[in-house]
Amino acid sequence: MVRLLSRWLPLLALLLMSGCTSLPDGARGRFEARAVKVDGETAYYQVFIPAASARTPGSLPVVLFLHGSGERGADGVKQTHAGLGPYLREQAADFPALAVFPQAPGRGEWSGRNNRVALAALDAAIAEFGADPARQYLTGMSMGGYGSWNIALDQPGRFAAIVPVCGAVLAPRAVRPTLFVEQVAGETDPYAAIAQRLRQTPIWIFHGALDDVVPPDDDRRLHAAFQNANARDVRYTEYPEGNHNAWDATYADPAMWEWMFAQKR
């Protein structure tokens, strides 16, 4: 019996140690479901609430995240399964901000009512959790990258910083004619128009050089337009070996978050 116990003692010790190092629920951030009514219809979204130990003194910063095409739907959850959501689950004990995850319906784009839903969800989260209106941040990936430009152009004085990931302005309209930045659709030079209207907003654009879904050409042109407009602080990072999923490297980059949270309105 003693010999049998001695064989299992190392395993028992390991299990006890792992149990001791796991964090209690209150020490980790969590997602909670919420709903908002816009134009008479209810839309569901998620809010990431940071752990108390991760919060800095004062009001919480808040990040509005716009998902890509693959996360569209009506379940109110799928939008947390790619991009920022998985990163927050990995960093649930340390991420210091609220994050709001609206969801566009099945074949919708980030435009019109869907953008109103996103902003209504953001407003509701700010009111419920006492977030800092001067520290609102906007990011989106792929379709959400387009949406980031649309919402930022519609609300030019609202966000302290914008981080569009693998988005574009016009391309690839031939493949998907509904996917474009509608706020500048009538402009002769939409890149220059965006740069002029947002040149006072800190922006960090990310893209993969090998992106074969949304090629990086538009983001390169946008960055050049911002430079020509003498923009206040616009950066562009292109991952040489990166494909469309540039969001994985972007959201895992501590320098990006440090820069973002340093911005205030």
Predicted regions located by residue number:
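Short glycine-enriched nucleophile-adjacent loop
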Residues: 145-156, 162
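Bacterial N-terminal signal peptides
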Residues: 9-18
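Active-site machinery of serine-nucleophile hydrolases
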Residues: 62, 66-121
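Bacterial N-terminal signal peptides that target proteins for export
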Residues: 1-9
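Structural recognition of the beta-strand scaffold that forms the well-ordered cores
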Residues: 46, 62-66, 98-103, 135-140, ...
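Gly/Ser-rich "nucleophile elbow"/oxyanion-hole loop immediately N-terminal to the catalytic nucleophile
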Residues: 51-58, 107-143, 156
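The feature captures the conserved acid-bearing segment of alpha/beta-hydrolase catalytic domains
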Residues: 161, 166-251
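A domain-start/cap signature at the N-terminus of enzymes
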Residues: 20-62, 139-141, 184-186, 220-224, ...
